[in-house]
Regions:
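Glycine-rich phosphate-binding loops of nucleotide-dependent enzymes
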Residues: 1-125
Length: 125
């Protein structure tokens, strides 16, 4: 196995699973592997489209830690598209919220999450 690949597996605590097929990994580990694989190309932007889809709350919490780790330790921007607002609020510094393709609100996370239109569209009243 390539040294760079093995190093990324270690960073994401997947090195002990290096000989396993990705399809046999738990869902949370599959997401970590997908992120590690993307990082192997040394991108400047990491686009994550609904990464928490299908995950249970424990897996989502681990995913949040993983994304925070990437955001804080790799020199790149993370663009997150996600409906899980607890994940979004736990990671994002800035938000742009769309509803049916129209921009509802944009700004700092805490401010956006207080916006009445955002609450109605995504958080429920």
């Amino acid at each position: 196995m390539d040294a760079k690949a093995l190093e990324l597996l270690k960073v994401f605590e997947l090195d002990d699973k290096a000989s396993l097929l990705a399809s046999g990994l738990p869902y949370g580990d599959q997401r970590k592997l997908e992120i590690a694989r993307a990082l192997a190309t040394q991108p400047k932007l990491l686009l994550l489209d609904e990464p928490a889809a299908g995950m249970n709350p424990n897996e989502t919490a681990e995913l949040m830690d993983t994304i925070r780790f990437v955001r804080d330790n790799f020199d790149m921007t993370v663009l997150l598209i996600e409906h899980d607002m607890s994940l979004v609020s736990g990671i994002c510094e800035k938000l742009s919220v769309l509803n049916f393709g129209q921009l509802l609100c944009e700004g700092k996370t805490a401010e956006v999450l207080k916006n009445p239109e955002v609450i109605t569209a995504y958080l429920g009243e």
